[in-house]
C-alpha cells in the first residue's frame, strides 16, 4: 500500500473548489483540466478564469466545460480582460462555493489522489490551514527534470516560507483563505507567498506537507519565476509588509534567510543563462551563512553549478547535461 492509498478522508467533508487561472496555455489546458476532473474526490467544483488569453485558451475552456458532466462535478468559466495572476485568482476565489479551496496552475498536472490527500492532511490536524504535496518538475514536453525534496519539518511557518517557499498547488480551508484576505494584485511575483505568510501570521506553522509526489510543476520559458530580478524585488515587498506587522527574526536567522534567498536567486539566474549574476549571487549567499550553504546537499549542488560556469563552455554544457539526466532518472 502506498502513502496515498493509506490516506482517506470521508466524502461528507464537502465540496472542493479548484481555482484555475489561465493565460495563453492552450497546449496544456486540456490535460490540466482532465487531471482535475479525474480526482477521486466526490464533489469537485472547477472555476477556470481566463485572464484575457490570446491563443484560444478561453474558447477551449468553454468547450471543456460543456463536457464536464457527471455526479459531483461542476465547472464554471470566467472570462476577463488581462489583469494578472492575482486578479484572476481573486475572481475565482470570490466565485468558489466549497469548504476547501485549491489554487492550481493551468499548465500543471494533478496526480490521482492529490485532492483527497490534501483534505485528509487538514482534517488530521486542525492546526493546519493549508496543505501541499511534493511535486515533480517537468519541462514543456512533460519530461521530468527533477523533484522537490521534502522539507526538514512537516509543518511550515512564516520564516520557513520566506527562506524557501516550497508551496505549490495548495489546498486551503476556505474560511482561513478568506480571513487572510485577497491576493495582492499589485505584486508582480510572489503573489502566492504573500498570501501564505498572511495565513501563517494568523496561525503560526499552519502549512502542512503531504510527503509524496502528487503533481507535476511545469517549468517554461517566459514564466515569472524565470526572472530573478523580478522575484527579488517582489520578495522584498512581501518582507516589507511583514516587517511592518512586526516580523523580526534574530540576526542568525536573518543571515540564514539571506543565504537561502540569494542561492535561490542565483539558481534562477543560472537557469536563465545570466551566469555572471549567478556567480555574484552565489558568493553573497556563501558569505551570508557558509554553514547553511555548504552543510546542505542541494545547496552544495547549486553552488557548484554556479561555479562551473567559469569552465570552458563545452565542458560546462556537458556537466549540465549529465546533471539534468541524473535528476530526471
Question: What do these predicted regions represent?
Answer:
Residues 80-96, 117:
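Glycine-rich, basic loop-to-helix element that forms the pyrophosphate-binding segment
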Residues 101:
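Short aromatic/hydrophobic "clamp" motif used to bind/position activated sugar donors
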Residues 18, 94, 133, 147-236:
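Conserved nucleotide-sugar donor-binding catalytic segment
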Residues 35, 42, 50-60, 105:
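A conserved acidic beta->alpha catalytic loop
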Residues 1-37:
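N-proximal low-complexity "stem/linker" segments adjacent to membrane-targeting elements
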Amino acid at each position: 500500500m502506498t502513502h496515498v492509498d493509506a490516506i482517506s478522508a470521508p466524502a461528507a467533508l464537502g465540496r472542493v473548489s479548484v481555482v484555475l487561472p489561465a493565460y495563453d496555455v492552450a497546449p496544456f489546458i486540456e490535460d490540466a483540466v482532465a487531471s482535475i476532473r479525474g480526482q477521486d474526490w466526490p464533489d469537485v467544483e472547477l472555476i477556470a478564469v481566463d485572464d484575457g488569453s490570446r491563443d484560444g485558451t478561453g474558447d477551449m475552456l468553454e468547450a471543456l466545460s460543456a463536457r464536464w458532466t457527471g455526479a459531483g462535478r461542476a465547472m464554471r468559466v470566467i472570462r476577463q480582460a488581462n489583469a494578472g495572476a492575482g486578479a484572476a485568482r481573486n475572481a475565482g476565489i470570490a466565485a468558489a462555493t466549497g469548504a476547501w479551496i485549491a489554487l492550481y496552475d493551468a499548465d500543471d498536472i494533478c496526480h490521482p489522489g492529490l485532492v483527497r490527500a490534501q483534505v485528509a492532511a487538514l482534517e488530521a490536524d486542525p492546526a493546519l490551514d493549508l496543505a501541499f504535496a511534493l511535486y515533480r518538475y517537468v519541462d514543456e514536453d512533460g519530461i521530468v527534470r527533477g523533484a522537490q525534496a521534502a522539507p526538514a519539518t512537516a509543518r511550515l511557518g512564516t520564516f520557513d516560507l520566506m527562506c524557501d517557499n516550497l508551496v505549490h498547488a495548495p489546498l486551503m480551508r476556505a474560511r482561513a483563505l478568506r480571513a487572510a484576505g485577497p491576493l495582492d494584485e499589485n505584486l508582480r511575483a510572489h503573489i502566492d507567498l504573500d498570501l501564505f505568510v498572511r495565513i501563517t501570521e494568523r496561525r503560526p506553522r499552519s502549512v502542512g506537507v503531504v510527503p509524496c509526489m502528487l503533481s507535476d510543476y511545469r517549468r517554461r520559458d517566459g514564466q515569472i519565476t524565470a526572472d530573478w530580478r523580478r522575484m527579488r524585488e517582489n520578495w522584498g515587498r512581501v518582507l516589507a509588509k511583514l516587517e511592518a506587522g512586526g516580523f523580526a527574526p534574530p540576526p542568525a536567522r536573518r543571515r540564514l534567510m539571506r543565504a537561502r534567498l540569494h542561492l535561490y536567486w542565483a539558481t534562477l539566474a543560472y537557469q536563465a543563462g545570466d551566469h555572471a549574476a549567478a556567480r555574484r549571487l552565489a558568493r553573497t549567499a556563501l558569505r551570508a551563512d557558509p554553514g547553511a550553504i555548504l552543510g546542505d546537499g542541494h545547496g552544495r549542488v547549486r553552488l557548484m553549478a554556479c561555479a562551473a560556469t567559469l569552465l570552458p563552455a563545452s565542458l560546462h554544457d556537458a556537466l549540465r547535461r549529465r546533471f539534468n539526466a541524473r535528476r530526471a532518472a
